[in-house]
Amino acid sequence: MGPRARPALLLLMLLQTAVLQGRLLRSHSLHYLFMGASEQDLGLSLFEALGYVDDQLFVFYDHESRRVEPRTPWVSSRISSQMWLQLSQSLKGWDHMFTVDFWTIMENHNHSKESHTLQVILGCEMQEDNSTEGYWKYGYDGQDHLEFCPDTLDWRAAEPRAWPTKLEWERHKIRARQNRAYLERDCPAQLQQLLELGRGVLDQQVPPLVKVTHHVTSSVTTLRCRALNYYPQNITMKWLKDKQPMDAKEFEPKDVLPNGDGTYQGWITLAVPPGEEQRYTCQVEHPGLDQPLIVIWEPSPSGTLVIGVISGIAVFVVILFIGILFIILRKRQGSRGAMGHYVLAERE
């Protein structure tokens, strides 16, 4: 995997870890993704920022233009000039902080000539009971690097080479307290403002359409449970065997992808013994559903019809072949009989 792919891969992993943890209860989140490259030959700017409320991109900032751009209609049309000014100033401040942190990490690694990348994800999540949880993580050159611990005001090193930076940052207690204040106070306050701003959009609930499909190969029979076109994206999917929940280790983990229209799709798969498909059911829980939805695989009527048509055609072809063969044999027998009478008549 080349260096261009590593930052994107790390961001996806961090995002799944910190934000995409499917929970049945409706939660809301605000998080920012920062990324940059020390040299622009990696296809990245020196600093780019993406802001997400829940799972919707609402703001973008780029170091080169130093412009803050709204990315959703409800932000463009509803945000006040004062709130937009505060958001713009904070992103420009993050730009400066990111650059300082980037050079600190590079110096602690004795990296100066080569191109390197830095990724940061920070934000907060709010549950229905208004409890909040913050996160602040750094990735360097496509690898997890440092994570801030607001309870203890220190940093957790994800790899040995992160220790010099960890020790340096832990000497700055003022910064640690500022980080905690952001995660526990400023981030939840901004999230509340954005939720109010996005009322009617962010609080909608679209239940999933659930289907179970059947796939057969030479040696494996696989059931796939798909949940389609739902919002929000937190969803619980599991397999039941004889109406009893199965251990998650027995089937492949859930995959979730955006559809591009604001909704999501997710699926889980399970290998089953041939002929035992009816023993397994898929259970789906989602905030848009009043109760868990249980779906079983049902053979497609069209599939049965196709098999019947193919069988009928095969029988017809066999009968037609036998009929043609019978006619040919009778003609040959008739020809031989006529030849025999002609020869006898000639001898007389």
From Swiss-Prot:
Tissues of expression: Expressed in all tissues tested except brain.
Q: What are the start and end residues of every segment in region (Alpha-1)?
A: 23-114
Ranges for domain Ig-like C1-type come to: 207-298
Per the record, the domain of life is: Eukaryota
- Per the UniProt topology annotation, the Cytoplasmic ranges are 331-348
Q: Where in the cell is it found?
A: Cell membrane
One of the record's GO cellular component terms: HFE-transferrin receptor complex
| Start and end residues of each stretch annotated as Connecting peptide | 298-306
Any idea which UniProt keywords this protein has?
Answer: Cell membrane, Disease variant, Disulfide bond, Glycoprotein, Ion transport, Iron, Iron transport, Membrane, Signal, Transmembrane, Transmembrane helix, Transport
Write down the membrane topology.
Single-pass type I membrane protein
Result of altering R6S = In HFE1; uncertain significance
BP GO annotations:
BMP signaling pathway; cellular response to iron ion; hormone biosynthetic process; intracellular iron ion homeostasis; multicellular organismal-level iron ion homeostasis; negative regulation of antigen processing and presentation of endogenous peptide antigen via MHC class I; negative regulation of CD8-positive, alpha-beta T cell activation; negative regulation of proteasomal ubiquitin-dependent protein catabolic process
In this UniProt entry, which residues form the Extracellular topological domain(s)?
A: 23-306
User: Which residue ranges traverse the bilayer?
Assistant: 307-330
Q: Which cysteines are joined by disulfide bonds?
A: C124-C187, C225-C282
Query: What disease does the record describe for this protein?
Result: Hemochromatosis 1: A disorder of iron metabolism characterized by iron overload. Excess iron is deposited in a variety of organs leading to their failure, and resulting in serious illnesses including cirrhosis, hepatomas, diabetes, cardiomyopathy, arthritis, and hypogonadotropic hypogonadism. Severe effects of the disease usually do not appear until after decades of progressive iron loading.
What's the family?
Answer: Belongs to the MHC class I family.
* Self-association state and partner proteins as the record states: Binds TFR through the extracellular domain in a pH-dependent manner.
Tell me, in a sentence or two, what this protein's role is: Binds to transferrin receptor (TFR) and reduces its affinity for iron-loaded transferrin.
The name of this protein is Hereditary hemochromatosis protein
**What organism does the UniProt record list as the source?**
Homo sapiens (Human)
